[in-house]
Every structure is written in structure tokens, then in C-alpha cells.
UniProtKB/Swiss-Prot annotation:
Catalytic activity: L-tyrosyl-[protein] + ATP = O-(5'-adenylyl)-L-tyrosyl-[protein] + diphosphate; L-threonyl-[protein] + ATP = 3-O-(5'-adenylyl)-L-threonyl-[protein] + diphosphate
A GO term for molecular function: ATP binding
Superkingdom per UniProt: Bacteria
UniProt organism field: Salmonella typhimurium (strain LT2 / SGSC1412 / ATCC 700720)
Protein's UniProt name: Probable protein adenylyltransferase Fic
Binding site for ATP: 84-85, 140-142, 146, 172
GO biological process, one term: regulation of cell division
Purpose of the protein: Probable adenylyltransferase that mediates the addition of adenosine 5'-monophosphate (AMP) to specific residues of target proteins. Involved in cell filamentation induced by cyclic AMP.
EC assignment: 2.7.7.108
SUPFAM superfamilies from the UniProt entry: Fic-like
Amino acid sequence: MSDKFGEGRDPYLYPGLNVMRNRLGIHQAQRLAQAAYEMTALRAATIELGPLVRGLPHLCAIHRQLYQDIFDWAGQLREVDIYQGDTRFCHFAYIEKEGNALMQDLEEEGYLVGLAHEKFVERLAHYYCEINVLHPFRFGSGLAQRIFFEQLALHAGYALSWQGIAVETWKQANQSGAMGDLSALRAIFQKAISEARETE
């Protein structure tokens, strides 16, 4: 579905095609991408806020809810190495260990509840970047992660909106974050995060 994945035989792909094996029997990348977009949009609307206390299993549950109609492995941690541009994501064998350690850190910070806006933005950018580099799933990590952090923000009294964020700006911010520079991510979240209204 893109050129972001590593070389070599990939068990997630149909033989000879750069198309992921799927439950829909689609063998064309563009058609699969469109179907995934439409079906995950419907599934996303059914995802409940979930508990304040959240860990790697909760992120997996979000992914499973989103992609259960499309991939047999929905909600399962990836078993191959992948990369995007100059960013090489976490080696698959370390995902569970590193993911649990990150979630433990998040728990020790009280899931960022009670932080003033500036501090919340700073810590959210940190955790967002770390989990993005983890990239736990073969496909769909980004969407699952965005929902995970939308929920986290709501529990902390904030609303996180992705509207108005340019795709290239977002990609560059994440790549810079992976290299240790969180300034662009913080700038984006500074604008994207606001106090939640009662109805949210």
C-alpha cells in the first residue's frame, strides 16, 4: 500500500504484489486503501471512550475494532520490521517490551491528568512521538494511535482535533520527532489541543 516497508519477503503481502492480504479479497492497492478508509471510518464512530487506565492492550483493542473487517491480524503486534522515509520503526521483537515500558511511564505520570495546557502539550508530544516510533502494527498504527490520544486528552479535560493539520507538515514533524526534535510536534499540538467542552 506504500513504499514504507522493509525489503524481503513480507508475509503480510500477497505474493508478487505490494498489496496486503485482506479479508475482502482485494488485490489492488488503491481499492484496498479506499475500502480501509471507508470501513475504519464507520468502525471509529463505534469506539467508546474507554477507561482512564490504559496500556498496550487498549491500543491493540482500538486497532482490532478499526480493522477487524479487513485484516485477520487486526489488533496483533507486527512481526516484521518496517520503515518510512528515513525513519526506521522499533524492531518488531522489542515492541511489546518497549510498549509496556512506555505505558508504565504514562501511568506513573497519571495519564497526564491535571496538567496545565503547556505542560500537557509537552508531555503529549513526547508520548505521541515515542509510540509513533514504536509503530506497533503492520498497517493502521497511525489511526489507532490518534484515537488513543484523543481519548487520553478527553480524560485529561482536553480536546484534540486533527483538522487543519497539513499532511506534509505532520509527516515532517513526526520525522523530526523520531530524530529527537519535538519542537514541530509541540507547535502542532499547541494549536490542536484545547479545553474540552462538557458535551465532549
